Amino acid sequence: MTQSTPIRIATRKSPLALWQAHFVKDALQAAHPGLEVELVTMVTKGDIILDTPLAKVGGKGLFVKELEVAMLEGRADLAVHSMKDVPVDFPEGLGLVTICEREDPRDAFVSNTYNNIDELPQGAVVGTCSLRRQCQLKEYRPDLVIKELRGNVGTRLGKLDAGEYDAIILAAAGLKRLELEERIRSFIEPEQSLPAVGQGAVGIECRVDDERLLKLLEPLNHQDTADRVRCERAMNLTLEGGCQVPIGSYSLLDGDNIWLRALVGEPDGSLIVRGEIRGHRNDAEALGVQLANELLENGARDILTKLYADHE
């Protein structure tokens, strides 16, 4: 790659994916005036298989694989991901090299009739495709009917507006980025619904031997966000977490100290194993591993073993 070669960003075609790609393009060009950046749009399996729950068709990696193949084959230089959709493992030669500043990590309650979860009547229908959200909702309100909800943000809002659901739960970050914040009736605090690993953060994946690109991406990295997400992902990696499993986690920084909360649960909310850990940010990944092992010892291993057996 020469200095004048355009940087090619592989991206899905959904509005949110395109927002993220343009966000990185703009940030790169702001940091390096005159740099040429192109978007290479593509369709992934996750965009095609919309009639089946994610947990049954292989999880969130479905949204990433085609982008990774494009990078490995030299058709693209980098891919931009919503961190909550990034699998724990990367193909050889690729890596997560940059994590941008985190947007709001909370879940959002969206409804045309009700202001929050507490206002929902008995047996109300709530839409989500996330086992993590389902598990925490069912623990708090066992009477609620959880109905599968797939598609991009606009599709999901359309289904709500068509009357298929009393409410839906979406990531607040996505609604804010698409300038749809007015659709949010209330935010669900982490104390009530722990977010997904890395929720609200945008990550950049590229070939780890592309030294020119690594240098260009350096100004986009947000160290506070990177430390928090590394902590959450280390926990998830130790749990071997994927889309098939209700895992929530959220870390906060206070100076150089990091506080990580996490949970593993049964999809029906009948059992949730929770834990938390505090330590120095330099030990972010070790803390994530330690908390994961504590969760496993306290009952998460049994939940995970059962869930993975069900999906084989």
Swiss-Prot record:
Can the keyword Transferase be found in this entry's annotation? yes
What cofactor does this chain's UniProt record say it requires? Answer: dipyrromethane
Which major enzyme category is it?
Answer: transferase
Among SUPFAM superfamilies, the record links this protein to: Periplasmic binding protein-like II, Porphobilinogen deaminase (hydroxymethylbilane synthase), C-terminal domain
Q: Which GO terms describe its cellular component?
A: cytoplasm
User: What are its GO biological-process terms?
Assistant: protoporphyrinogen IX biosynthetic process
Q: In which pathway does it act?
A: Porphyrin-containing compound metabolism; protoporphyrin-IX biosynthesis; coproporphyrinogen-III from 5-aminolevulinate: step 2/4
What's in the misc comment field?
The porphobilinogen subunits are added to the dipyrromethane group.
Q: In which family does this protein belong, per the annotation? A: Belongs to the HMBS family.
**The protein's role, per its UniProt record:** Tetrapolymerization of the monopyrrole PBG into the hydroxymethylbilane pre-uroporphyrinogen in several discrete steps.
Q: What is this protein called?
A: Porphobilinogen deaminase
Higher taxonomy: Bacteria, Pseudomonadati, Pseudomonadota, Gammaproteobacteria, Vibrionales
